[in-house]
């Protein structure tokens, strides 16, 4: 049986600290890679041309390079999301299910055969799942749900051909909203995995307001506003919300949506606008 690919972008180095303050980043990355392989995936790291991953890891995974990097807008040589998708389509020969996840995600197959779930994806069916955060390695099972984004995605390669996400960067804000919402707006169906299987070790946040705002603007320009057209904001976002949900949303959620949307489309500060939009995305995608 063919093993599906899991794609990621391994960094040249990773920092994670245990309860005694020791940097266990290298070992943690090794554990992540081992978990992907143990869960039944062939692993491929997609990196920018000048990025070199540790030799030990390069022996465990396939490494593919993009032709360019996003240094100019991301501040470091990260791959563009669309370039990664193009590589994925090439590596998979344009067919079959594949997974895409962040490099610091540990997978577990204790409660679900996740690679089989990916391998058996039907056309225009996808997996979009959040992670469970944990603080120390020996207490992974005590992790808590991360409510504000998504870390594990799976699609069919022939469907991925239709995605156009040219301005987003893997590893920078908003790509994890842009990818699933693009799929959702094309009418793809979400295949839910009820049992937690993606885990993430907590670390100091490297949140960058400038980067968050910059790519939030890209999200508005590329994902939201093209679908708004000349429809009044309230009507557009009722439709936007209902496109994401398999069933019409209850009136309470619609009301909250409408209260937020005037700010999202230009009233109030840009930061407040993007913050509300991020929360709206997370809420709607959880109902998809």
Please report, for each region that a protein language model flagged, where it lies by residue:
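Short beta-strand-to-loop acidic/aromatic patch adjacent to the donor-nucleotide binding site
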Residues: 95-108
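Short, acidic, metal-binding catalytic loop of nucleotide-sugar glycosyltransferases
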Residues: 26-42
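Conserved catalytic core of nucleotide-sugar-dependent glycosyltransferases
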Residues: 105-181
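Short loop/turn segments at strand-loop or loop-helix junctions that form parts
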Residues: 6-14, 48, 64-68, 104, ...
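C-terminal catalytic/acceptor-binding lobe
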Residues: 4-14, 25, 169-288
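Short, flexible/disordered intra-domain loops and linkers
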Residues: 14-27, 71-76, 168-171
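Active-site-proximal specificity loops/subdomain of glycosyltransferases
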Residues: 16, 48-98
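Hydrophobic targeting segments
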Residues: 3-9, 36, 42-45
């Amino acid at each position: 049986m063919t093993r599906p690919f899991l794609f990621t972008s391994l960094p040249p180095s990773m920092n994670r600290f245990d309860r005694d303050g020791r940097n266990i980043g290298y070992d943690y990355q090794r554990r992540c890679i081992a978990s992907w392989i143990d869960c039944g995936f062939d692993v491929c790291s997609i990196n920018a041309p000048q990025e070199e991953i540790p030799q030990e890891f390069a022996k465990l995974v396939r490494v593919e390079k993009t032709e360019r990097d996003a240094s100019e807008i991301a501040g470091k040589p990260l791959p563009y999301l669309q370039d990664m998708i193009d590589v994925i389509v090439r590596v998979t020969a344009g067919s079959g299910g594949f997974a895409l996840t962040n490099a610091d995600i540990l997978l577990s197959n204790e409660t679900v055969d996740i690679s089989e779930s990916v391998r058996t994806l039907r056309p225009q069916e996808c997996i979009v799942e959040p992670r469970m955060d944990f603080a120390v390695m020996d207490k992974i099972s005590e992790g808590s749900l991360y409510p504000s984004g998504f870390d594990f995605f799976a699609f069919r390669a022939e469907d991925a051909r239709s995605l156009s996400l040219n301005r987003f960067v893997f590893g920078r804000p908003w790509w994890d909203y842009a990818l699933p919402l693009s799929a959702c707006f094309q009418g793809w169906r979400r295949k839910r995995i009820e049992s937690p299987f993606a885990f993430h070790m907590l670390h100091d946040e490297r949140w960058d307001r400038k980067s968050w705002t910059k790519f939030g603007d890209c999200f508005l320009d590329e994902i939201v506003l093209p679908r708004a057209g000349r429809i009044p904001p309230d009507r557009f976002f009722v439709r936007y919300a209902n496109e994401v949900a398999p069933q019409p949303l209850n009136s309470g959620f619609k009301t909250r949506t409408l209260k937020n949307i005037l700010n999202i489309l230009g009233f109030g500060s840009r930061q407040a606008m993007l913050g509300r939009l991020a929360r709206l995305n997370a809420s709607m995608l959880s109902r998809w």
